[in-house]
Amino acid sequence: MPREVNIRIAGTGGQGVIKAGLVLAEAFALEGKNVVQTQSYGPEARGGASRADIIVSDDEIDFPGLRRVDYLLVLHDSAYRKYYPQVDGETHVIYDSSLVNARRGLGFPFTETSIREFGTPLFANMIAIGALTAMLGLQPEKVEVVIQKRMRKAEENVKAFRIGFEMGRRVTKPKVVSHVVKPYILS
């Protein structure tokens, strides 16, 4: 059984991909996990490629880069086209069905839900993190603590996170990260 989980969150500048990665990484750290979070983004303030990579482990992390992708969370079609070729048949692919035309994976209407609930797409990242949190088995309270501490509009971001958590909970049995099971194949 693997004791390490590798997560990639990908989208475009302006979607809050980096912030989502930081929130998720800090929440895992609050659970006592070893965590490495790296990020990459284009020079454009909005619209360029953006990604956050998170490695979570019970053991020490000896290399800060992803060796494989266990979970790929994609918020934009261009990011899907860029990062989907790097996954294998065991990678969990979760995507924003509002913006991504995916070949396989589990789609959720993150952006549509954000617009419907808040009148703006700006909370889609926290809705997506909520769904991913449910799938990973991360304690939602830990994520909410980080959101309250680090995010502007904390109340709305917590609400968005909870909406996403319920979306994710409805379709999966949570996995406890300290006892990660072999990922299931989404098709």
From Swiss-Prot:
It catalyses: 2 oxidized [2Fe-2S]-[ferredoxin] + 2-oxoglutarate + CoA = succinyl-CoA + 2 reduced [2Fe-2S]-[ferredoxin] + CO2 + H(+). Pfam families: POR. One of its GO terms (molecular function) is 2-oxoglutarate synthase activity. Its EC number is 1.2.7.3. It comes from the Archaea. Keywords: Oxidoreductase. The keyword Oxidoreductase applies. The keyword Transcription does not apply. Heterotetramer of the KorA, KorB, KorC and KorD subunits. This is 2-oxoglutarate synthase subunit KorC. The lineage of its organism: Archaea, Methanobacteriati, Methanobacteriota, Archaeoglobi, Archaeoglobales. The gene is korC.
